[in-house]
Amino acid sequence: MTHDNKLQVEAIKCGTVIDHIPAQVGFKLLSLFKLTETDQRITIGLNLPSGEMGRKDLIKIENTFLTDEQVNQLALYAPQATVNRIDNYDVVGKSRPSLPERINNVLVCPNSNCISHAEPVSSSFAVKKRANDIALKCKYCEKEFSHYVVLAN
């Protein structure tokens, strides 16, 4: 029995590959992190087969590299993700996100009375790890929410 091992998503010469994103989360990452606000080519693989996860999403962004802060902010959505730096078609760096102390400019406060909705301020949440959850505390209204509530917002 032979297997054709072909790439399901075309390789990139230079840029970033975010792999092992939970299925159905890839589009949310593109939107929240404004990854599509570029003129560089972006390749997206959705519901790809994965030995570890069953199904996964994948994002490849040519000629673009994520900052350490951006990589760590992924931990809220895709804690098991792998972020690969690609140069000349080779992986030259590999990292996994770790939960940051603060997430800025990405999330929206679920408190409709929060001043962040009426004023031109950048969102900012303190991240607190709990036993079975992650809590996010808004810098402006100082209310604390389960990360599931903020992510659904």
Swiss-Prot record:
GO cellular component, one term: aspartate carbamoyltransferase complex
Obligatory cofactor(s): Zn(2+)
Intrachain S-S bonds: none
Keywords from the UniProt entry: Metal-binding, Pyrimidine biosynthesis, Zinc
Functional description taken from the UniProt entry: Involved in allosteric regulation of aspartate carbamoyltransferase.
Family stated for the protein in its record: Belongs to the PyrI family.
NCBIfam families, A to Z: ATCase_reg
Protein name: Aspartate carbamoyltransferase regulatory chain
Native source species: Salmonella dublin (strain CT_02021853)
Annotated gene: pyrI
